């Protein structure tokens, strides 16, 4: 199963924010430069993550972004459910004439659920715990 770039970069942004010292704000520009992604794309991602409560935005001269809740309370499966469209196949009868008898949609739904069930066992904090290699890459050690 492949996640959209939107979700991929959203998870990366959360991991980056979790690597910051508690209470430290950063800018969207810093996040975009860290992952070499378009600023416009990252603004949309940060806005969505903010709407979902995963990121807190602070306006003003000394503003920035940070996690909206502790990293050990941000469940990866929950993040993905919030921002990933999950249109695995188009099963509308006007697009596929075998829809009434097809069992593929059910099998794919079960696979998606197993995928999310596994990701529900992991938090953003889990991605950083005892992971000095990642912290070095994020320049946090």
Swiss-Prot record:
The record lists the membrane-crossing segments as none
Entries under SUPFAM superfamilies matching the protein:
Winged helix' DNA-binding domain
- Keyword terms, alphabetized: 2Fe-2S, DNA-binding, Iron, Iron-sulfur, Metal-binding, Repressor, Transcription, Transcription regulation
Q: Which residues bind DNA?
A: 28-51
Binding-site residues for [2Fe-2S] cluster, renumbered to this chain: 91, 96, 102
Q: Which Cys pairs are S-S linked?
A: none
Q: Which GO terms describe its cellular component?
A: cytosol
GO biological process: one example = negative regulation of DNA-templated transcription
Which ranges carry the HTH rrf2-type domain? 2-129
Annotated GO molecular function terms are:
2 iron, 2 sulfur cluster binding; DNA-binding transcription factor activity; double-stranded DNA binding; iron ion binding
Q: Does Translocase show up as a keyword for this record?
A: no
Q: Which Pfam families match?
A: Rrf2
Q: Which InterPro entries match?
A: Tscrpt_reg_Rrf2, Tscrpt_rep_HTH_NsrR, WH-like_DNA-bd_sf, WH_DNA-bd_sf
Tell me its cofactors.
Answer: [2Fe-2S] cluster
Quote the cofactor binding remark.
Binds 1 [2Fe-2S] cluster per subunit.
Please give the function described in this protein's UniProt entry.
Nitric oxide-sensitive repressor of genes involved in protecting the cell against nitrosative stress. May require iron for activity.
Indicate what this protein is called per its UniProt record.
HTH-type transcriptional repressor NsrR
Species name: Aliivibrio salmonicida (strain LFI1238)
């Amino acid at each position: 199963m492949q996640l959209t770039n939107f979700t991929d970069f959203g998870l990366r942004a959360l991991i980056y924010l979790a690597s910051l010292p508690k209470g430290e704000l950063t800018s969207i520009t810093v996040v975009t430069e860290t992952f070499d992604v378009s600023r416009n794309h990252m603004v949309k991602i940060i806005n969505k993550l903010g709407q979902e409560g995963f990121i807190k935005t602070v306006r003003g001269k000394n503003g920035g972004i940070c996690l909206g809740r502790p990293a050990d309370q941000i469940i990866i499966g929950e993040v993905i459910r919030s921002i990933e469209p999950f249109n695995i196949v188009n099963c509308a009868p006007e697009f596929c004439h075998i829809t009434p008898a097809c069992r593929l949609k059910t099998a794919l739904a079960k696979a998606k659920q197993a995928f999310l069930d596994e990701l529900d066992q992991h938090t953003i904090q889990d991605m950083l715990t005892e992971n000095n290699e990642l912290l070095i890459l994020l320049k946090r050690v």
